[in-house]
From Swiss-Prot:
One of its GO terms (biological process) is antigen processing and presentation of exogenous peptide antigen via MHC class II. This is HLA class II histocompatibility antigen, DO beta chain. It comes from Homo sapiens. The keyword Transmembrane helix applies. GO terms for cellular component: late endosome membrane; lysosomal membrane; lysosome; MHC class II protein complex. It is a single-pass type I membrane protein. Heterodimer of an alpha chain (DOA) and a beta chain (DOB). Forms a heterotetrameric complex with an HLA-DM molecule during intracellular transport in endosomal/lysosomal compartments in B-cells. Glycans are attached at residue 45. Keywords: Adaptive immunity, Disulfide bond, Endosome, Glycoprotein, Immunity, Lysosome, Membrane, MHC II, Signal, Transmembrane, Transmembrane helix.
Amino acid sequence: MGSGWVPWVVALLVNLTRLDSSMTQGTDSPEDFVIQAKADCYFTNGTEKVQFVVRFIFNLEEYVRFDSDVGMFVALTKLGQPDAEQWNSRLDLLERSRQAVDGVCRHNYRLGAPFTVGRKVQPEVTVYPERTPLLHQHNLLHCSVTGFYPGDIKIKWFLNGQEERAGVMSTGPIRNGDWTFQTVVMLEMTPELGHVYTCLVDHSSLLSPVSVEWRAQSEYSWRKMLSGIAAFLLGLIFLLVGIVIQLRAQKGYVRTQMSGNEVSRAVLLPQSC
């Protein structure tokens, strides 16, 4: 809250804690009670329209409210009528409350905007099929978009340059808990040879939309790619095994040399005697 606003709210609360006749309505004062003041700023289209509201609550019941749209204190219960009348009679208090729209709400908005409403994080986009893709067989293509902020985002699917609207499903934006979002947009497909699927992502953090392609390949191409991956992994395993064997062989050679020296000494000693 802005400077100059907190003191008068505190003063009002101190005044309320007296629980005078206007609050107790002639009854005995309760032993335990809670008085609260809650202030809220409501923004529409940035700071184009701002509403400042202060709620005064006695034992969980709101009884007096200041609304900048109304411009005065309003009693919500009989308990609040004397206080509303008293506060509305103080022109300095009314003026300070009305000025809070600029002095509190718009002021704090400018301070917090760079790391709240102005914060932007670019998304990471990945496209992958749900199952091993085979031509002419139904499958589901996933467009995974992660780590973006704010949550408003547009994601579209294209097949050979034409937008696909049918068979599109989305999880919607999901909060990650770290001020970022993630979402997955899925497309039902039956891939044909030569088909090019494109996931187009448009977000306020991007200078231009990001597109990621996925191309349908023949079963032979997939088998060839998988065979290449398997051959690479197998070669890597053989390489590691060879390195381990070589290291062990070098250690064995050193031990053999030491054993040979010991044997030589054992043979020479009797001859010297």
